[in-house]
Amino acid sequence: MTTQLRVVHLLPLLLACFVQTSPKQETMKMDCHKDEKGTIYDYEAIALNKNEYVPFKQYVGKHILFVNVATYCGLTAQYPELNALQEELKPYGLVVLGFPCNQFGKQEPGDNKEILPGLKYVRPGGGFVPNFQLFEKGDVNGEKEQKVFSFLKHSCPHPSEILGTFKSISWDPVKVHDIRWNFEKFLVGPDGIPVMRWSHRATVSSVKTDILAYLKQFKTK
C-alpha cells in the first residue's frame, strides 16, 4: 500500500478525533482527592519495544505527567508540544510518560512495533521522535484497563460531567471517572500522589501554565 493510500485510509480516524476537539463550555482541569490510599509507586508498566517492566517507583521525587496517547488523532499534534514541555520543565523534575491506547475512535490501530514508525513518518511525521518514555499499548478504561489508570481515575474526578455518546463508548463496565478521549493528562506529585487531571480539550500550553503554578510551592522549600 502506498503512503498516499495509507493517509486516505487513516482520514476517518483523524476526522473522528477533530469532532471530539470541538470547543465547548466545560471545566478543563480538576484537582485530585487528597485522602486516597496508595501511590503510583505501587504500579509498573512495560516499556514500548523493550519488553521490560518499568517500576514507577524509579520516579520517586519527580513530578510525573501521565498521558494516554494515540497516533492517528487530531490531538496527535500535541506530541511535539509534549516534547517541548518535557524539555523545558525537565530541570524542575517533570517527567512525561505516554500510554498508547486504541479505545477512542480506534486511533491507535497498529501493534506496538508500528507506533514509533507511525509517529516518525505519518503523524506528526517529519522524522518526529518522542523524547519521553512510551509504554506498550493497553486499555485505560473497562475490564482490562491498566491498574495504574484505575488508581489515577479513582484518585481524580473527571473535569467534565459528560461521559460521551453510546457510539463513542467501546468498553465495559463504564464508570463516571473514565477517560473520555485521547490525550487526557494526570499530574502526580513527587510523593507519588495524584495532584490534578485535565480534559483532552485542555491545551498543552494551559497544562504547562497549571504545572508552573503548582511548581512554585517547591521553590520555597
UniProtKB/Swiss-Prot annotation:
Residues 1-21 form the signal peptide. Its main location: secreted. InterPro entries: Glutathione_peroxidase, GPX_AS, GPX_CS, Thioredoxin-like_sf. The keyword Oxidoreductase applies. GO terms for cellular component: extracellular region. It is an enzyme of class 1 (oxidoreductase). The active site is at C73. Its EC number is 1.11.1.9. Pfam families: GSHPx. It catalyses: 2 glutathione + H2O2 = glutathione disulfide + 2 H2O. Keywords: Oxidoreductase, Peroxidase, Secreted, Signal. It is found in: Secreted. Epididymis. One of its GO terms (biological process) is response to oxidative stress. GO terms for molecular function: glutathione peroxidase activity. Protects cells and enzymes from oxidative damage, by catalyzing the reduction of hydrogen peroxide, lipid peroxides and organic hydroperoxide, by glutathione. May constitute a glutathione peroxidase-like protective system against peroxide damage in sperm membrane lipids. Belongs to the glutathione peroxidase family. This is Epididymal secretory glutathione peroxidase. The lineage of its organism: Eukaryota, Metazoa, Chordata, Craniata, Vertebrata.
